[in-house]
Amino acid sequence: MKNLEQYTRYPKGKSEKKLSGRLGLYWDESIQDWELIVSDSKRISEFLKVYQTELKDDDDKFTLMGLIVSSFDDGINKADAEMLELWEICKTILKKECFLHFSIIEYWSFLEEKDIENVFSITLYIREVWNDVRLNFEC
């Protein structure tokens, strides 16, 4: 494997604050794991639309994608056809922008865990993304 540190990113407070204002979400500078706290599976379509039409800054895109994936994790167990269609859009973005979203893909894939009873609800879906992009990160 290549040195993967170069692809490691973390959400930026500045982006969290900006996105909170844009999306009407709670934000406080003392919050850790903002994307987990404010996730909302009912708003995935809105989040994806903002991602696709309004964002140019990589920090903002990374931070919003973290919120989107966390929101999928909240709702994927009771997914209907609409949510699965939204997942296909998200999956396409993750694959296309895999270098930007490497940290999100790696975290939610939970690759070291083999027992599917001990993974996130979204893990099996994200592992499909990982399987499609991992060659980009191998020697």
Q: Where do the language-model regions lie?
A:
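Alpha-helical solenoid scaffolds in large eukaryotic transport, assembly, and signaling factors
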Residues: 2-3, 7, 14-96, 104-113
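Eukaryotic acidic, Ser/Thr-rich intrinsically disordered low-complexity regions
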Residues: 2-6, 98-139
